[in-house]
Structure formats: C-alpha cells, structure tokens
Amino acid sequence: MQRIFLAIDIGASSGRHIVGIEADGALQTDEVYRFPNGVQRENGHLIWDIEGIFQHVKAGIKAAFAKYPHIDSLSIDTWAVDYVLLKDGAALLPCHAYRDERTQAVIDEVHQHMPFAKLYRRTGIQFQPFNSIYQLYEDAKTGRLQQADDFLMVPEYLLYRLCGVKAREYTNATSTGLVSAATKEYDPEILRALSLPERLFPRLTQPGTVLGQLTPDVAREVGGQTSVVLCATHDTASAVEGIPMAENAPFLSSGTWS
C-alpha cells in the first residue's frame, strides 16, 4: 500500500516542500516547491515576513496537490527560538528575527532575576543571546507581551493558519529556555522570576499529534484536503529523528544560525 506525505521544511535562508512516497518498504522523495527566505530590516530591527512565508507554504501545498492528488498528511518544521504573538487570533507584528540585536540590552537583567547557572540546571539549554527567553523578556519590557493573548512558535503559527488548531510542540518549546528538563513543561518558577504571564504558556504537546484537517478556505485554495500533523517542529529535532542511530549516540548540528 502506498502512502504519501508532505514535509514542509523552512530554514533561515530557504524553504522547501518535499513529498515522501512510502511503498514496498522504501521511501522516495520529490521536492515539489522551493522558495527563498531571509530577514528584512524594518524600523531598525530584523524581522521575518511571516505573511509572505505563509503564502509560500500554501503555494507549495498547491504544487504538491497538483502532482499528488491524494496526500495522507503534512507537517511543518522551521528554525527554532522565533515566535509570533497573537491577539484575538491575529498576529501582532512584527515577527522579530533571532539575528536582531534587541536582546543584548536585557540579557544581564534576565540573569539578575535568575542566574544563568540556575537556568541551565533547570532547562539544560545552552546560552545563546537569541534564545526566546531573552526575546520574550524584551517584549515584556516594551509592553508587547501584555498586548498578546497567545504565543506560538513560528511553525506552530503556520500550522495554526492551515488548520485553525493551536498547539505548543515540545521540541521547539525547549529552545525557548523556559521548559523544565524534569517536567517537560514550561517551568513556572522561571516564568514567575521574569514576570512572564503564565497564561501564554500552557501545556505542551508531543510530536506525532494529529491536529486536524486543513480549513475549508485553505483546502479550496490549495486544491486538496489532508490531515495536519504536529511533527518535531524544531528542524534540528526532525533531522535527528531521521538519523538511524543508537540511543545516546552523538551528532553534530550546524546550520545558518552557526
């Protein structure tokens, strides 16, 4: 029996839609769409054209359905740490890019509230100046966070736009620097120490969860209907999941960010 899946992999410099055809114990892949990606400068900050990215997501799905009328499911992964704030279901723009230097001024202040050594003990996440924890703290200082009633990492936002269902995927959430390595949920002690509103950080969902179907409007636009699945939405996590390796084996990760 043949099964067909659509993987949408979006990096900091390009995105691609790859159809996987599983048949007779083998997997064949077919890249059906590719688009350039990159940061833009707006009002002195580096941002993502998140609406433009979403339009490319839909264009690629349409290209996939044109070639493969039946697709069993699709999912999206992207780079980590960046996110979209929402109000009443709509994005509060801009969507800042991790390369923007807005976090530099708040890093020391974050560590005054919770020293990095303690953060590392609780989360296991190495220090990077672009980690979401510093971005969110800066958004709190400027008042943007208080305007929001929801918070989604970039791939979960794109999936939400496709199917209308919000989810907070575990592997990508760990890149925020806010997830407890012990409980595998957002750490309330860190949130309280930084005065980040806990209402924005509900329970996490594990990869492999079926979110639903494409919304009727999206299905009409792309020319087909399929299940929308929550993959390991951090692109590195999805890449590692595909490596045929033993437990506790080392791997090397390098991308545009490095």
What would you call each of these model-derived segments?
Residues M1-P94, A105, R121, Q147, ...:
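N-terminal glycine/serine-rich phosphate-binding loop of ATP-dependent small-molecule kinases
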Residues I10-A12, Y120-T236:
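Gly/Ser/Thr-rich active-site cleft segment
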Residues A90-R102, T174-L178:
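A charged helix-plus-loop insertion that forms the helical arch/lid used to bind
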